[in-house]
Structure formats: structure tokens, C-alpha cells
Amino acid sequence: MDNEEENHYVSRLRDVYSSCDTTGTGFLDQEELTQLCTKLGLEEQLPALLHILLGDDRLARVNFEEFKEGFVAVLSSGSGVEPSDEEGSSSESATSCAVPPKYMSGSKWYGRRSLPELGDSATATKYGSEQQAKGSVKPPLRRSASLESVESLKSDEDAESAKEPQNELFEAQGQLRSWGCEVFGTLRKSCSPSFSTPENLVQGIWHELGIGSSGHLNEQELAVVCRSIGLHSLEKQELEELFSKLDQDGDGRVSLAEFQLGLFGHEPPSLPASSSLIKPNRLWSHYQEESGCHTTTTSSLVSVCSGLRLFSSVDDGSGFAFPEQVISAWAQEGIQNGREILQSLDFSVDEKVNLLELTWALDNELLTVDGVIQQAALACYRQELSYHQGQVDQLVQERDKARQDLEKAEKRNLDFVREMDDCHSALEQLTEKKIKHLEQEYRGRLSLLRSEVEMERELFWEQARRQRAVLEQDVGRLQAEETSLREKLTLALKENSRLQKEIIEVVEKLSDSEKLVLRLQSDLQFVLKDKLEPQSMELLAQEEQFTAILNDYELKCRDLQDRNDELQAELEGLRLRLPRSRQSPAGTPGTHRRRIPGRGPADNLFVGESTPVSLETEIMVEQMKEHYQELRMQLETKVNYYEKEIEVMKRNFEKDKKEMEQAFQLEVSVLEGQKADLEALYAKSQEVILGLKEQLQDAAQSPEPAPAGLAHCCAQALCTLAQRLEVEMHLRHQDQLLQIRQEAEEELNQKLSWLEAQHAACCESLSLQHQCEKDQLLQTHLQRVKDLAAQLDLEKGRREEREQEVLAHCRRQQLKLQAVMSEEQARICRSFTLEKEKLEQTYREQVEGLVQEADVLRALLKNGTTVVSDQQERTPSSMSLGPDSRQQPTARQAVSPDGRTGAPAEWPGPEKAEGRDFPGQLCSIDAMPSPTPTLLSRRSSENLGVRDNHQRPLNAEEGAIPKEPEPSARTLTGQGQKLPLPVHPQMLEPSLGTTALDRKAASVGVQGQASEGPVGDGEGVQEAWLQFRGEATRMRPSLPCSELPNPQEATVMPAMSESEMKDVKIKLLQLEDVVRALEKADSRESYRAELQRLSEENLVLKSDLGKIQLELETSESKNEVQRQEIEVLKRDKEQACCDLEELSTQTQKYKDEMSQLNCRVLQLEGEPSGLHTQKEENHGAIQVLMKKLEEAGCREEQQGDQIQNLKIELERVNEECQYLRLSQAELTESLEESRSQLYSVQLRLEAAQSQHGRIVQRLQEQMSQLVPGARVAELQHLLNVKEEEARRLSAQQEEYRQQLKAREDQVEDAEARLRNVEWLLQEKVEELRKQFEKNTRSDLLLKELYVENAHLMKAVQLTEEKQRGAEKKNCVLEEKVRALNKLISKMAPASLSV
């Protein structure tokens, strides 16, 4: 072990030793030694160690060196076990002869030694050869009392010893033995002179740890053993290396023999025995064994120099030295044979020498051997003593130098303290002046700031009230608008429901009228068949009337058609003006026209189209109302919160003000009471003094005239007695005066001394207290100024950061909203452009289709005009053929009721022939409207039902007239003319193909054939033509562009029109015959009455038609009203949007105002910084303080903590004020005590004066008889002396009173300063509270802005969701409308064909 490690373990042992030294003297008694051994883990060695150190004297004390020697001796005796060899031979410990000690001191013996017996020389020689053999391989480990044992004992307390590599733990010099001593020594059950072998020790360890029962250890059990012996920090790799090193046979287990060989393979069994001397360890073992009987001795030099160790000059701290160093040390002293001396002392010249063992060996040699060795030992001791003497001298010099340095340092410190005191006093005076100046400046500025803040607060509240009134007006207006909109919506809903009911009723009336018309037609046909004769020529006279009626109806129809076209155009314009969500999703404007005649689901869909509009508007209005309600609630909550806060602040301010006023009033009242008491006491004392003065004057003046009179009266008679009494009285008076004077002087001196001491103590305490309070107030004020400046800087920085964050957040929100709005606008624009393009495309296609249809219709019209002109030319000729035709009873072609022609047959009579001829005529008349599709583009689907109602009564009239047999008809048929009625549908079908126009024409022809009623006049023809035109107009919007006639069909159309014109001519001829027949039948009144009735019914039906038209007009007007209401709702919506924009502008305005307020707050906060800069320019000392404040301002402290600190400081100042008040109360009490004492003194003085007065009076009475004038003069002199003493006492009393008044003035000044400081602190606290409230308000405003932004975002999301829902609904409605259009297009032909 090197020097550093040894010094380290010695220092650690000394630290443990010092920790047990409770007295601090450097000596330990028995209890402290027991505690030290417990800390070192030496419970088993404790009795032996106590016996070695203390002996029988349990009250003795030992120092560190003695403990170290005994400690090493105990450990070396515990480790001095001789292992046995293989043959079982062991060396026996020699017994020593007891030598009596040379000196005994108590329980300690000095000069004792042991002489062990010599062992077997052969055994010793063999043992020495073994040691030399093993020493050639490894250096031997010595069982000496070195500091290795200290290292082993401290290994459990220090973790560093466990961090060494494993090989060093087992191979380092001295390490294994000390480790084995520690482990095996502490685990033994008892401490006895006879020890076990290493095998038994290892087995004992395994048994205590509960491992190795099978005689082998695995890796985990080896780790447990290593931890138990102090190797706690072995890593896994090191443990594996140790296990592989111990496992020599490689079976994966460590046996007991392998473990023992690995642990003790490097340990020498023992050291060789010398023929002349025994090793020191054996000496110490014998000493351990013989310590109980007190028969052993030690060296006298060693005992005198306790803890002495030789060769300290060559000791590096480890307790070992090289033999060369020892030999050279001896050579320096003149001893040349040092190597032989070492060998003779059984020390090897090739290894390090244990200096302690060498010391003991030399000590033993000094006692036993004379000669050169003794000289060498003495030289060593002399060298050691000289070395230590040099060290002591060096230490003394260092101590003296340190003492001089300390004195110099103390002088410098005193000088520095004086300078610092002067500097501090100057600084205090300067800071007091500056603080007063600053207080005045701050008071003025604080008053100005307070007035400005009050004005700003009033302005803020005025603005808030105005804004609140404006917002309340806006809310009221919005509520009124909301109620009006809601009322309008309810009215619109009611109107829609009423219109739906009216339309349903009209549809029911139409169905009833249709049924009535059919019934009337059947009745009329029956009547005409039965009663109308062909000879009644009266009907022919009514031809002109019927033509006029037809013309009137045609004009009315045209007017209605024009009116319907105009209404249709207006409806189309309205649809274009409506938003896309309210428009019809169909591609053509005729989608809704096909819904009214259907009367079913289409009718309900058309009527309820305005319901989504009203619901959407109502939802929007509800949302607006909720938003305004929320805004109003938020505004009310804000106003209420601010009002409550202001009220609380006012109440707190009033409360604090009242408390302060009450406190000040109490203090003033207490001071006034004290002042009144002092004044009363002063008045009383003055009165007492005046009374005393008067008494003294009276006593001095009254006896003057008496002595003369008495002297003259009694001089002669009582001269002898007067002299004797005078002497006695004089003596007695002198004694009494002396006694009274002494007592009064003693009392006065005591009182005065006590009062002076008390006064001095009070003055000193007050001055100290005043100085402390002044220093504290100055420090608190400066600290407060620093804190306020730092707080202002922090608040300014935080406010700037907060404003930047808010502005950045607002910018981000604004950018997001702008992006969302731009996206929304772009999307709306795209959808609008797409919709516009679609509508333009559809309208373009419709216009193209209409143009093509108009061309076709123009061609048809041209052909129709030619046919009509030919018909007009043929009319006279046909009329001329009438008589001839009536006379020809030829066969006719029969027409079946289903429209098919049959073969000519013989008719049984003229009546039947005529009856069969009229259905054919009716069929030919019904087929006539086919060539008149010129007005298809003008018809609208809304007037279809009206035209049907108008058309069916006319058809009834037409069908009722030609049922009477007519001669003209028979004449026509008799000429062999065959009616080509069934040819028209067959011609129309190939010409038009699968178009809807062919289907309508065919359905009209079939309907005319099924009726089997002959047409009687031209009015029926016109009505039939109108019916077909209405059907064609109704079917025109459903015709797609692909169904327009192509060029091939255009070539077929002229041929078809020519044939149809021929048929029309034939029908006209037949109608003329019918008219003549009706004119001839005019003679029959019954038939006329029937015709009159039919005409009246026709008029009634016309009036019904007019009513229906009026109802339609009213419905159109109602629709117009609804459209206006919708426009009003639009305007309201725009107004609401404008209101939202106004609210947003108001919020922006509020934000601007808040930023202005923040700027104003920053400006107000910047003013103190400006003041600080001004103070920096004016005052140099305050500039240093401000720099410190700016440096301290970098620290971040919360405002609430600062306010709390200020409150705590205010409480502390209040406590100090209370303490001052208590001190003042104590002073007043002491003053009262002094006054009471003074009063008692005055009373005693008055008693003495009264007694003195009585004595004087007696003396005067006696002197009136005996005392002469000289005696009176002496008494007067005594009275003057007393008066001087009384005046002196009054002067002292006046001085005391003045001092008391000065103290009271000082107390009042201190209280005034404290009030000023409290006022300043309260103002600072109020300012900080206001600033905190402003910060909270700004935070609340920011939070409200965030909430408003969130609401706006939610509103935008809701509108987007609603728009998506509306688009989805529009898509669904478009699909439904397409499906309904398809369904109607399929159902319409079937319904018309029925």
C-alpha cells in the first residue's frame, strides 16, 4: 500500500475518532470507546481493546495515538493464526518469562517485555525455507500491525475499496490479509486465543449465508459471498472472470478447496523464527494473551513517547520503508553495518520494512542487548527527536507569522469599519434628503395621476353607458324585426295552407262539374235522339247566333291565352330572380305546368314548394336571435361584473377609509387625553410649588416682630432658662435638620439617579429604535421603489408580449376568415356560373326547339289556309246539292261505335239510318282539329283545367244537337258519299311516328268516335279544335328536341293536311245541313225551351269559368304577395348581415379602444421610468440604485406575489407601528411612575415642610420667650437654604418636563412619518390593485374576443353545413322531379285516353 492510501485510511480513522469525541478534548473515555468500536464493527474485539487501552481503571481516557496502537495490536493478535502444514506439524507459541515493569502509573505498566521460548530449530529452518521459496514468486504478506487493518475495517464504509479490479483485491500487497482479518474476524462467534483454520472459516461463512450445502458454489452463490465480504460493486464481467479463475477443473462449480486455494494461495503460512529473537507479532500475541494478568512490560522510551514511531523521515505514510532508506539513515549517523542489523532483527533486506515492527524490535533490543545495536537505536531516536524538533520550530514560526498577519488584518478591518461607518452616515444623510425630495415629487405626481385616472374612469364609464344604450336599442330593434318576420312567416304559411285547400276544393268542383257535364251530355243526346225532328228548320236560323257565340268564345280564349302567356312570362322572370335553392330543378319551365292537371303528388309538391324557403328563413332568424341574445347577455354580464367590482372597490375603500379615520381619531384622542393629564399634573405641581413658596414666605416673615417684644418682656426673668433651652433646642434642631437633610438627599439622589438612568436608557432605546426604524423605512422604501420599477418593467414587457400575441392571433383569425370567405365566394361563383351555363344551355335548346316547331307549324298553317279557302269555295255548291241529296235513299257506309267502318247494309227505316249517320258525322268532326297545331307554343299548363271545364259543356252542346234525324243528312248520305273517318288516325300515326302529338291526335279521334254523337253546328267544330289545340299545347313542353319533325316527316305533312282538309270540308257541309234542319225545327217550342235551358246552363258554366279565372287571378296576386314577402325576407336577411358587419366593426372598434387603453396604460407606466431617468441625471447616487433596479428588473416575479409581498410589508409596518405605540405606552407608564414618584417626593417634602413649620412654630413660641435675634437669623438662613433646594427641585422637574415634551414630540414625528409611509404604501397598493384590475379586464376582453371568434367560426360552420344540406335536398328534389316527370309523361296519355 502506498503513502496516499495509508494517509487516506488514517484520516478516515481520525474522522471516525473525532466524531465520537463529544467533549472535543481529543481524549475518549470508556463509553466513547465503546461507541467508536461499534462504528468500526469491533464488537467482538471490544473487551480486549478496552483492557489494553484502559486496564482496570475504567475512568481513564486515551488519545488517538494510544487508540491506534491498541487498535493495531488487537487486529494483529486476531490475525496472528499459524496455519498447519500438510503433515499436521504446527509451530507452538513460545511462552515468555514475565519481567516486572520498570515503571507503573495507575493501571499502565512501562518497561515490560516477553521472552518467548525458542522453538524447534529444524521446524524454524524448514518454515524459513518455505517462506523464501514463496517470496521468490510473490512478495510475502506480513501480519504486522500496519494501517492495512484500518483499510480493511473501513472497506464496508467506503465503496471505493470495492471498485478495484478483482485481481488487485487478491494480489495486492497487504490487501488479502487485512480483508481476511476483517471478514473472518467479524464473523466469528467469540474471541478466543485459539482460532480455526481457513477451511473452517470459509465453511462458517457459507453456513451463515445459507449456501454451499453441497460443497460447491455456482456463479450466483459466489456473487452472494462477494457481497458479504464487501465486494458490492462487482460488475457481471468481473464476477465471471473471478468465477472462471476459481473454477480450475472447469466443471462450472467452485468447490471448497478451489475457493480456499484461490483466496489463500498468495499468503505465507508464517514468518521464520530467529534463533536469537522472536518476531514482533509473536510478541504482541503474547502481549494479548498476558494482558489479563498484568505481567508483560513495554519499552520505557516507547511508553514515554506514546505513539512514537522511528524513521518518520523516510516514512511515506504507509508504515513501510525500503531497507536501503533505513540503512542510509543509519549510515548518516555513523552506523555502517545496517544490513546485518536488519538481518539480525529478522527483517528481509529485499522487502519493505514495517517501521512499527522495527521500532518495537529496536526498543526490545535496547532493553536486552548492549553494543552496537543499542547505539544504532539511540541514534535513530536522536534523529527522530531532532526531526520533530525542527518541525515544532517551523510550526512555531508559522504560528507567530500567522498571529502577526492576524493583527494586521484586524487593524485593517478596524480602519475599514471606520471608513464604512463614515460612508454609511454620509449616505444616510444624503438618502434622507433625497427621499424627502422624492416623496414630495411623488406626492404631486400621484395626485395628478389619480385625477387623470378618475377622469379616464369617468370617460370609460360614460362610453360604456352610451354603448350599452346603443346595443340595447339595436337589440330591441332586432327583436321587433324578428317578431315582424315571424308574423310574416306565419301569415305566409297560413296563406299557403289556405291556397292549398282552395286548390283542392277547385279540383273537387272541377271533377263534379265534369261529372255534371257528362251527365248533361248524355241527357241532351237522349233528348235530341227522341224529340228533335229533322224537319225543324228553326235551328238553321240560329246559325248566325252560334257563329257569333263561337267568335266571342274564340276571342275570349285568345285573351285568356294572351293573359296566360303574360303570367307565364312573369312566372319565368320570378323563377329567374329567385335563388337557386328555390328554383325548380327541372330543365324546362313546363315542369310545373304538368302538375296541376295531374292532381296528386305533383300538385302537393308544387303547392308546398315555398315551405323550405320559410323554414330556412325561420332557422336563420332563430340563429340571429340567439346570437343577438348571447351578445346582449354577454354585454349585461360584463356591465354587471364591472358594476359589482366598482361597488366592491368603493365599499372596500370606504371601509378602509373609515378604519383609518377611526384609528387616527383614537390615537388623537389618546394623545389629547395624555396631554390633558400632563397639563393637569403640571398645573397641580405649579399650585403645590406656589403653596410651598407662600408657606415659606409666611414662615420667614411672621416671626420678625415677635422676638423684639418677647425679648423685652422675658429677658430678665428667664435669662438662665432661655440659655439652657436654647442650647438644647439648638442641638435637637441641628440633629433633626441633619437627619431630615440626609434622608431627603439620599432619597433625591436615589430618585434622580434612577430617573437619569431610566431617562438615559429610554433615550438610548428610542434613538436606537428610531435609527432602526429609519433604516428599515429607508430600506423598505428603496426596495419598494425597486420592486415597483421591476414590476413596471415586467408588466410592460408582458403587456407588449400579450398585445403581440393577441394581434398575431387576430391576424391569423382574420386571415383564416378571409381565406374561408374567399373560398366560399369562389365556390358560390363557380356554382352560379355552372348553373347559369346550364340554364342558358337549356334555354338555348328550348328556343331552338321552339323555332323548329314554329317552322313546322307555319308550314302546317299555310296548308291549313289553302284548305280553308278551298272549303269556302265548295260551300255554295254543297248547299245547292242539299235537296237532291235529301231525296236519295242510297246505302251508307256503317260506322261501328269503336270507329271502324263496316260494309253498307240495308236500313230498316229512315229513322235508324239517320240515327246511324250522326255518329259518323261526329267522328269526322272530332277528327278535324288535327291540322291546327299552330299555337302549340303558346299554351301553358296552368290554364289546362280551365280550358277543359270550358270545353266540356260546349262539347255537350255539340253532341246534343245532331241527335235528331235530319233530312239533309240523309240526302247527303244518299248520294253515296262515304265518310273517311277511320282513315285520319291511321294517317296521323305513320306521319308523326311516336311523337306525343300523334298520341294526342289519336286519343282525340278515339274519344270522338266513342262519343257516337253527331255534331250539330260550327261551334262544336270550333270547340273540338280548341280542345285539340289545348292538348297539343299541353304536350308541347314535354316534347324534347329529338321529337321535332325531321325533313322526311315534313314531306309527309302536306299530304296529310290535304286529306284532313277534305274531311273538314265534308264536315262543314254536314254541319250546314244540320243547321238547316235545326232552323226548320224552330216551330217546336219544347225544343226551344230545351235549347234555352241549355243556353242558360252554358251561361252558368261561363260564369263559373269567370269565377275560376278570378280565383286564378287572386291566386296569382297572392303569389305576388308571397314573392314580395320573400323579397322582404331577403332584405331582412341582408339587413341582418349588415347588422353583423356593424357588430364586427363595433368589436373592431372595441379592440381599437382596448389597444388605445393599453397604450395609455403603457404611457402611464412609462412616466415613472421617465421620472427615474430624470432622477438619474440629477442625482449620481440614485443612478447607481436605478442601475441596480434595472438589473433586478430582469427577474420575473408575478404581480400577485408582489402585491402579497407589499401586503405583508404593510402588515409588518403596521406591526412596527404597533410596537412603537407599545413603546410609547411603556414610556407613558414610566412617565406616570416618575410622576407618581415625584408626587410622593413632593408629599414627603410637604410633610417635612409642615413638620418643619410646626417645629419652627414651636421654636418661635419658645423663642418668643428665650430665643434671641441671632437665632432667628440662623433659622432664616436655613429657610433660605430650603427654598433654594425647592427651587432646584422645581428646576429639575421643569427639565424633566421639557425632556418629556421633547420625547413626545419625537414620538409624534415618528408617528407622522409612519402615517406618511402607511399612506404611501396604501397608495402603492391601490395603484397595483387598479393595475391588476385593468389587467384582469383586458384578459376578460381578450377571452370574450376569443369566444366571439369561436362563435363566428361555429356560425360559419353551421352555414356551410346548412348549405350542404340544402344542396343535398336540391339534388334529392331534382331526382324526385325527374322521376315525377317521367311518371307524368307515362301517365298523361293513359289519363287522356280514358
UniProtKB/Swiss-Prot annotation:
Intervals of motif KEN box: 494-496
Highest taxon in the source lineage: Eukaryota
Post-translational modification: Phosphorylated by PLK1 which disrupts its centrosome association and interaction with gamma-tubulin. Ubiquitinated by the APC/C complex leading to its degradation.
Residues modified to Phosphoserine: S149
Compartments, as annotated in UniProt: Cytoplasm, Cytoskeleton, Microtubule organizing center, Centrosome; Cytoplasm
Gene3D superfamilies: EF-hand (1.10.238.10)
Alphabetical UniProt keywords: Calcium, Coiled coil, Cytoplasm, Cytoskeleton, Metal-binding, Microtubule, Phosphoprotein, Repeat, Ubl conjugation
Recorded coiled-coil stretches: 382-423, 461-515, 544-584, 835-863, 1057-1229, 1269-1331
The record's note on its domains: The KEN and D (destructive) boxes are required for the cell cycle-controlled NINL degradation by the APC/C pathway.
Function: Involved in the microtubule organization in interphase cells. Overexpression induces the fragmentation of the Golgi, and causes lysosomes to disperse toward the cell periphery; it also interferes with mitotic spindle assembly. Involved in vesicle transport in photoreceptor cells.
Subunit architecture: Interacts with gamma-tubulin and TUBGCP4. Interacts with anaphase promoting complex/cyclosome (APC/C). Interacts with CDC20 and FZR1. Interacts with LCA5 and USH2A.
Protein name: Ninein-like protein
Gene for this chain: Ninl
